[in-house]
């Protein structure tokens, strides 16, 4: 099937005199997770991971993805004729180098400029120009092959009340216009759906697990417009737009509107697609959108709400842990059935809307695939042995959650116990960090990796990511990683109100996977002659499975942290449990 699709794509390439065609994982808005309409890379390659770029040449094809997906991609690409390129590994070429190496002068590279951000497109152009290669950015060739392509979504919107958001649309627009004045630009083009959702206190369900509407916006010093189908707007949102003089235009009208912009226009090249920038008559000012940082700095209302969302989520996951530990080996269960059980328990919580991403429910060796997704063809039964890794989260009106626990269901090996403890040590060390204001996540990442690096072991992904507020579960700019990646903006200072995940792990192919994840918020600590100190407070409250620990490997300080954390878990979660569940939780949170 994949070979047939690639063959049809090559026929279209020949018709358009294209020798290389790039299929990124993206949509018109540079969204991390895309709706079915934009699942072009998945359709053409069969690889279902959330990140990857497919390059099809006339005689071969290759797919690039990161360390989260090496094992999964190798399995899913087998027999497809598509070579796996493990990004960042020795000897693996960059995408542009691969293209240049395999094409000859005056050949043409094609892609759909609507699904390529400007920064990436200009980087390709720079390399291709040097190699005397042409670039055609107006080709949606996958659309010509994908005959039963789904429709663009157009779900009803809902107004996100200030009771949850903590700031009015009027205030946000005022802040944005003040930024434009300060930077001496006349307008800004916004295409990131999460930024637009934040700015207009607007939510919808266009993308599974990501409560946003596909839309564009242009804001100037005098006016504002949003580009989406007006028929899908709820009454409160329409009133909000009217009160703030926001004009509603058709979704596809953005290209006429951007072409008509005069004066200086601010464009974030990392998010605005290349087709829009190519369409501008005005000279763009390339600069990061200020909304990226503004929405990462949660206000008091957002923090109050998200703390309550995490209590509710903690209740659901703790109830699940009780059920799982009690019933493993006694009743029939599988990866897919326990995943459904967890979703059911979440759905019983007030103001639950949906999961915040597709749950990773991975038993034994499946957990070595960091982002494994259980499907009927891979689903396995769960018994009272080994470990079960579940990475999951919920979208509540009060906020977004993300948690991973590795559950011990029976006997485990000494190797598994050793690495379970080492990974938890890393989690504790980062959780307990005190640091001077001015640090970024890159300064602190070693705390989480240290216990693993001491043994020459690593995990091939970041330690943590920012988390949105009833928005995307992966939110920039804050995060934890050890390596500076120029295309990512993670050098930002960790500031008060930023929420970041903390999720070190160990992954042994063919054997097991372990991950321990909480969300944490940055708070101010003491200020003295050395400066302003900061630290983290946990938002996630679910016990770590003490059945996996080798306590002898923990320092006294680490044991104290874990005991204090578990005491908090019991105090915050037990009031919402049955007497049997609370009694079990007391044991699960026992002092070590």
Regions found by a protein language model. Give the residues of each.
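Active-site neighborhoods and metal-handling regions in enzymes and metal-associated proteins
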Residues: 1-592
């Amino acid at each position: 099937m994949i070979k047939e699709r690639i063959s049809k794509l090559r026929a279209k390439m020949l018709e358009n005199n294209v020798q290389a065609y790039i299929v990124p994982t993206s949509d018109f808005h540079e969204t991390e997770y895309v709706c079915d309409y934009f699942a072009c890379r998945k359709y053409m390659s069969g690889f279902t991971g959330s990140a990857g770029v497919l390059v099809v040449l006339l005689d071969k094809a290759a797919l690039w993805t990161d360390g989260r997906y090496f094992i999964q991609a190798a399995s899913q690409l087998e027999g497809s004729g598509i070579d796996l390129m493990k990004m960042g590994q020795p000897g693996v070429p960059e995408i542009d180098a691969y293209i240049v190496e395999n094409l000859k002068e005056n050949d043409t590279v094609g892609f759909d400029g609507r699904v390529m951000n400007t920064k990436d497109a200009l980087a390709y152009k720079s390399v291709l120009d040097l190699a005397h290669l042409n670039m055609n950015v107006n080709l949606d060739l996958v659309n010509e092959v994908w005959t039963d392509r789904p429709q663009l979504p157009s779900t009803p919107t809902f107004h996100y009340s200030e009771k949850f958001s903590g700031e009015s649309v009027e205030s946000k627009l005022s802040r944005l216009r003040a930024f434009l004045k300060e930077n001496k630009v006349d307008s800004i083009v916004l295409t990131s759906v999460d930024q637009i959702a934040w700015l207009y206190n607007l939510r919808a369900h266009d993308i599974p697990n990501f409560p946003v509407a596909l839309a564009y916006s242009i804001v100037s010093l005098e006016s504002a417009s949003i580009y989406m189908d007006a028929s899908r707007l709820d009454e409160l949102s329409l009133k909000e737009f009217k009160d703030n003089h926001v004009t509603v235009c058709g979704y596809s009208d953005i290209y006429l509107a951007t072409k008509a912009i005069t004066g200086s226009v601010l464009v974030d090249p990392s998010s605005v697609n290349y087709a829009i920038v190519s369409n501008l008559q005005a000279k763009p000012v390339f600069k990061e959108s200020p909304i990226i940082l503004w929405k990462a700095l949660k206000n008091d209302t957002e923090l109050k709400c998200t703390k309550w969302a995490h209590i509710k989520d903690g209740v659901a996951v703790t109830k699940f842990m009780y059920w799982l530990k009690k019933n493993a080996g006694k009743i029939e269960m599988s990866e897919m059935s326990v995943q459904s059980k967890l979703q059911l328990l979440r759905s019983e919580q007030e103001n639950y809307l949906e999961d915040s991403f597709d749950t990773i429910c991975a038993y034994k060796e499946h957990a070595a695939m960091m982002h494994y997704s259980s499907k009927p063809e891979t689903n396995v039964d769960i018994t009272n042995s080994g470990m079960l890794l579940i990475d999951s989260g919920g979208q509540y009106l009060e906020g977004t959650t993300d948690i991973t626990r590795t559950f011990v269901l029976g006997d485990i090996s000494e190797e598994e116990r050793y690495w379970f403890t080492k990974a938890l040590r890393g989690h504790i060390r980062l959780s307990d960090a005190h640091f001077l204001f001015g640090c970024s996540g890159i300064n602190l990442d070693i705390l989480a990796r240290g216990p693993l690096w001491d043994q020459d072991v690593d995990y091939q992904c970041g330690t943590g990511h920012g988390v949105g507020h009833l928005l995307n579960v992966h939110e920039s700019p804050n995060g934890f990683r050890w390596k500076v990646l120029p295309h990512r903006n993670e050098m930002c200072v960790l500031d008060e109100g930023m929420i970041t995940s903390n999720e070190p792990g160990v992954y042994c192919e063919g054997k097991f996977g372990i991950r321990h994840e909480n969300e944490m918020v940055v708070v101010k600590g003491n200020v003295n002659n050395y400066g302003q100190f900061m630290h983290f407070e946990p938002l996630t409250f679910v016990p770590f499975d003490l059945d996996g620990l080798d306590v002898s490997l923990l320092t006294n300080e680490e044991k104290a942290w874990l005991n204090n954390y578990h005491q908090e878990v019991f105090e915050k979660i037990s009031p919402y449990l049955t007497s049997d569940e609370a009694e079990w939780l007391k044991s699960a949170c026992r002092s070590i």
